[in-house]
């Protein structure tokens, strides 16, 4: 009988990962799964492991400073083991979204919007940090603890994105594919630069200050925006796609605060709002893309991830709770949950 369909496939050159939903045991038996002279199915599997970890890391930023550690770990198992693979199969497993013509090269929707939708569901049930919003609706800034470290983290992400997008070609077997990877690298970098510059300019015009956190999120927004299709745009088009992402992330962060949706690092805006823009932007550069298919992918992925995440977050909240106590939040979750201080150099001994 014919084998069952693969769990994931690459969007790229019609190569399909043969790691099947019933075949994960092959990985644990350390059997080398078939590929060809230039492509390994096992490398495709590893990419999916990294991608789902990326989606879960988006959630971690949005629920920071008030989430129970073990409740977070429990949801991580659910997202990585169930929620993500289902919608991942829809596109990268030759599923119905792939058949419908939905395009997502490296995961603006499958990875980034997925993580943002799961984060939004959790944040709505979790609530805002204490003191974030005043009784009259005012938004109180809670500055990050270490901006140089945040800048370093953004640089690391920027560099890592070359592997995220360029590696999504999955194989380099001839000069054409080598040139394709090089173009992906260039477009990825240009989009990040465009996002950073335009987020910085908008924050200066809007707030009167060159906001570093907005600039850093602008760079990430540019990267997310180009992830859906980094191969077909020209470098100039990639810059503009990233620039629009940089503008959108600033507007989205401000609007979410007005709605009292507390996202400490702007993860929902960076990966959700801009992830949607990235999927729509494919229509401007890829002649194979259709607006209908892209909208279908956006709605279906968001609806699946948000609905299932909300159900599981709600169940966890009712069974074990998801939020630390007010005293633990004031003390710091690093101390209350882990028994360690993240920044002991700033704590005076009594």
Locate the predicted segments by residue.
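Cytoplasmic-side transmembrane-helix entry/capping segments in multi-pass membrane proteins
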Residues: 68-76, 210-219, 266-269
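Hydrophobic alpha-helical hairpins/lids featuring a short glycine-rich hinge
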Residues: 38-77
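Extramembrane terminal tails and long inter-domain/linker segments of multi-pass membrane proteins
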Residues: 132-142, 316-350
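Transmembrane alpha-helical segments of multi-pass membrane transport proteins and ion-pumping complexes
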Residues: 49, 53-62, 80-89, 116-120, ...
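Structural signature of hydrophobic alpha-helical transmembrane segments
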Residues: 41-50, 181-192, 236-243
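Core mid-bundle transmembrane helix pairs that form the ion/substrate translocation pathway
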Residues: 132-195
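Single conserved hydrophobic/aromatic residue that forms the stacking wall/gate
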Residues: 1-28
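Inter-helical loop and helix-membrane interface segments of multi-pass membrane transporters/permeases
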Residues: 22, 26-47, 90-107, 136-137, ...
């Amino acid at each position: 009988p014919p084998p069952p369909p693969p769990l994931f496939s690459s969007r790229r050159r019609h190569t399909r990962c043969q790691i099947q939903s019933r075949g994960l045991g092959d990985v644990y038996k350390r059997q080398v799964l078939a590929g060809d002279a230039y492509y390994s199915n096992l490398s495709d599997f590893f990419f999916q492991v990294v991608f789902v970890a990326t989606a879960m890391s988006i959630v971690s930023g949005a629920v920071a400073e008030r989430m129970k550690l073990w409740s977070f770990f429990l949801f991580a198992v659910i997202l990585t083991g169930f929620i993500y693979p289902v919608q991942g199969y829809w596109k990268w497993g030759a599923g119905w979204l792939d058949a419908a013509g939905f395009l997502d090269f490296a995961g603006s929707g499958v990875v980034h919007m997925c993580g943002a939708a799961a984060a939004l569901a959790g944040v709505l049930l979790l609530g805002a940090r204490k003191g974030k919003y005043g009784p009259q609706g005012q938004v109180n800034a809670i500055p990050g603890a270490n901006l140089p470290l945040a800048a370093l983290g953004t640089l690391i992400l920027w560099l890592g994105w070359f592997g995220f997008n360029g590696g999504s070609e999955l194989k380099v077997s001839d000069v054409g594919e080598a040139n394709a990877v090089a173009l992906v690298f260039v477009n990825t970098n240009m989009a990040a630069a465009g996002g950073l510059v335009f987020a910085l300019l908008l924050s200066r015009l809007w707030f009167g200050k060159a906001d570093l956190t907005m600039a850093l999120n602008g760079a990430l927004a540019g990267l997310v925006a180009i992830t859906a299709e980094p191969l077909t745009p020209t470098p100039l088009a990639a810059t503009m796609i990233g620039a629009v992402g940089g503008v959108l992330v600033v507007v989205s962060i401000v609007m979410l605060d007005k709605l009292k949706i507390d996202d400490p690092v702007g993860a929902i805006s960076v990966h959700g709002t801009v992830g949607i823009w990235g999927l729509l932007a494919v229509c401007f550069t890829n002649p194979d893309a259709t607006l209908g298919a892209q909208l279908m992918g956006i709605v279906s992925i968001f609806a699946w991830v948000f609905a299932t995440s909300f159900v599981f977050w709600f169940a966890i909240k009712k069974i074990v709770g998801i939020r630390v106590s007010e005293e633990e939040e004031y003390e710091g979750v690093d101390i209350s949950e882990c028994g360690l201080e993240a920044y002991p150099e700033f704590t005076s001994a009594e």
